[in-house]
Amino acid sequence: MKAVVLTLAVLFLTGSQARHFWQQDDPQSPWDRVKDFATVYVDAIKDSGRDYVAQFEASALGKHLNLKLLDNWDSLGSTFTKVREQLGPVTQEFWDNLEKETEALRQEMSKDLEEVKKKVQPYLDDFQNKWQEEMETYRQKMAPLGAEFREGARQKVQELQEKLSPLAEELRDRLRAHVEALRQHVAPYSDDLRQRMAARFEALKEGGGSLAEYQAKAQEQLKALGEKAKPALEDLRQGLLPVLENLKVSILAAIDEASKKLNAQ
């Protein structure tokens, strides 16, 4: 199981190169991708959750209970933001160390990816050119039919559709043929890349010393991350206590008020 975790970590780190396999822009670091995703995800949850709380407080029941959930939500959001800022340097250090420890393996895998990319690129360029040629040919064949449609009456619509149908089918068949040709050209290189990756990890697994070393370093980094995260998590717990207590008091007060009104009736 530890080997699987380590393998996934290495794949994730090499993903900063693999995700740009067909692209020309500079790759984003693993930490930047994780940080961006986490920030967007947490902010989305926080914003949507706040909207629900605001809607509830604006309702008749929310006004009657007067739980002040929105104040508690904002306080809770501030606490989470503080904890996230505290954990930022810790998780950054963890990713930096993990990247450093797997540098050699990632370089080998990136080299394999680049080699396959160079072999496949001519087929991709040829496919793109053929695709554009087919679309241009189709556009030229469509031009006179479009003029005929604009000049013709409604009763000619059916006739125009009958003329367009063979052209569309011809384009579809030709594009399918190009896609199939590309698939056949690229398939051997995809299989080769898959075999290379499998061989890399098999060699890592069979080399007991290397694998044990990677596992030990990964465990050490995870342990260090856990130790450094403890203060921030404790701050989170302390920040949650007054929020939960305030919410508890508000709910009990609302229940008590409701009970008194029922008894008075």
UniProtKB/Swiss-Prot annotation:
On tissue specificity, the annotation reads:
Major protein of plasma HDL, also found in chylomicrons. Synthesized predominantly in the intestine and the liver.
Chief place of localization: secreted
Consult the record and explain the modifications the protein receives after translation.
Glycosylated. Palmitoylated.
InterPro entries in the record: ApoA_E (IPR000074), Apolipoprotein_A1/A4/E (IPR050163)
Where is this chain's protein located in or outside the cell? Answer: Secreted
A GO MF label: cholesterol transfer activity
Report each sequence repeat as a residue range.
67-88, 89-110, 111-121, 122-142, 144-165, 166-187, 188-209, 210-230, 231-241, 242-265
Query: Where Methionine sulfoxide occurs along the chain?
Result: 109, 135
Where is the secretion signal located? 1-18
Q: Using the UniProt annotation, give all residue ranges assigned to the region (10 X approximate tandem repeats).
A: 67-265
Give start-end ranges for the coiled-coil region(s). none
Q: Could you confirm whether the keyword Signal appears in this record?
A: yes
Keywords tagged on the record: Cholesterol metabolism, Glycoprotein, HDL, Lipid metabolism, Lipid transport, Lipoprotein, Oxidation, Palmitate, Phosphoprotein, Repeat, Secreted, Signal, Steroid metabolism, Sterol metabolism, Transport
Sum up the protein's function in the record's words: Participates in the reverse transport of cholesterol from tissues to the liver for excretion by promoting cholesterol efflux from tissues and by acting as a cofactor for the lecithin cholesterol acyltransferase (LCAT). As part of the SPAP complex, activates spermatozoa motility.
* Quaternary structure note: Homodimer. Interacts with APOA1BP and CLU. Component of a sperm activating protein complex (SPAP), consisting of APOA1, an immunoglobulin heavy chain, an immunoglobulin light chain and albumin. Interacts with NDRG1. Interacts with SCGB3A2. Interacts with NAXE and YJEFN3.
Q: Please report which protein family the annotation says this sequence is part of.
A: Belongs to the apolipoprotein A1/A4/E family.
- Tell me the protein's name: Apolipoprotein A-I
Q: What is the lineage of its organism?
A: Eukaryota, Metazoa, Chordata, Craniata, Vertebrata
Gene name, Swiss-Prot/TrEMBL:
APOA1
